[in-house]
Structures are given as structure tokens and as C-alpha cells.
């Protein structure tokens, strides 16, 4: 027999049930709920709320974006409400952070490594920090940034992925601008970095990371070879997939690329890539972010350089969306970024 009780959260409901009610509320409304009472604010900041949202299948996928302007300011995009939320400024001492890695695990956004892209307006000199080992996490429940355990080494322009609740980084460049084959893995539960086997190959080009079929793939700019983490992190395998070069995005476990003014579905082996949609209208747009969310590909921000019709660089806050699962995929505009504009320095999905 269940006895009536008075809850400190919602009168007449056990706290366990009240937490489930709060977990079903979209994150968009949390700032208003924080104002209800101290007990609600404490409940909304609890790490248990993320676990409850996951357990009752009430998680949301939000798009996280950092653009060149304004400095070190992230925004979150809610696709269901077509709405942008501005986060508190990231408290890093590195000005105009760039060349970093970004990933999402445990309901938090992690910003890893990178260096300064600041240029002295008087002398034209670049800041001396090319790569760093610092790590920051953002908790959307407490709406606060926190400094986490530093990487084992400074790095920039490296591959970074979240996989099985952990973060893996590999390759990139040191602060001396020397390429590295070192790799490491981060556990958010213990706030600790541990080494992984070195990449089989180090290249003097930037690299990115993708998770495909449950494995991390490291791709180097300008090269067709891919390095794949095998055996639960025991070694790396080198494959030549012959993939087209260009911005890539994962949608429903399929890899898409923007190449030669077209969106194509990338395939391995001798299977030809599948044409999905024309994207020729974006050929004059550079420095944009491209990422998959749900059934769609998002193109965010970027710049349009000088040309016959304009004499200066135009920074964009535009968002363009393509549903690759529809019978006839067509581009549609999304709500533009409300604060950020220009080249996209970081782009990731946050599941909360």
C-alpha cells in the first residue's frame, strides 16, 4: 500500500515521481523552472536528472556551435523549437580559441586543447599559443563551465570523438607545430586521461575524427587513407577507402560529404557514391560547419569572401537544412544564429 506523502518538490507526489516529471520538461524551459524554488533549482542541477532523462527516453539532441565572432562564445540550437540559446562565455584565458576538439559525453559539452587565433591589431602578430592541453566542460543543467583534467600533452588540429561514454583524441600538432601520432582516452567519471597506442602514421596535415560502425576513424586532410581504432583500443588499422574530400557529416549511421557542389552518400570499396542533392549555392561559402542531426544535415555559419559583387568578407549567421531521408531532399532555411557569426571553429551534438 502506498502512503501519501508531502514532497519537497511537488505537493502530493513522491520526489522520485516529481524528478521524472521534471526530466520530461524540455531543456528550453529550465531557466524558468530554476526560479520556482531552491529545491527545484537543486533538483534541476542534479547529475541524476541526466540519468533519469536517459532512462525514461526523454533526452534531447542539441547543436553546439562556436563561431569566430564573438570570441569564445558558444550557442546551442534546439531543432524542435528552431531556437538558439547563448551560453556563458567560456572562461579560458586563451583568446579566440581555435584548432580545438569538441565532444559530448555524460550530458556535458567538452572543449579540448587548441590554441589562440588572436592577431594583434597593431602589429599583425599571432598569439604565441598554438596548442594547449586544457579541457573545459559545460553543464547545461547548472549552466556553468568547469576546468577538467588536462590532456597528457598539448595538441591542436587533432581528431576528437566520443565513443562508449568516453572521449578519444589522436594526432594533430604540438605547440611547436610538430605533428604527433600520440593518442589518449578520457573517462569523464574519473576525470582522467590515459594513453592509447600511437597512430600507425603521422602526417603534416590537420585530422578529424568520425565514429563509424562503432569505431573511431581518423581522417587526414588531403589523404585518402583512414586509420581505424581496433580491438577496444588495442591498435590502429590503416585502410584506403578512396573517399571524396570535403566536409562530412553522419546521419543515421551513414556518411555524407559535400564535394564539387553536391551532397553525396559516401560508400566504401567499389560501390559508387550516391548523389543526394545539389549544393551549388554554397560554393562561394567557406568556413561553415556541417553536421548531422536527426534525419538532416545542417550547414551553419561561414563567410563569403571578396568577389565581383562585394569587396569585403561577409560573416554569416545563416543556417541551411537538408533532410536526406525525404524522397526529394531540398534545402530549407533554419533560424540564423542569434549571436554567433563567421567561420565555425567548433560544432558538435549534445545529448541531454
Language model region names:
Residues 1-352:
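Kelch-like beta-propeller repeat domains
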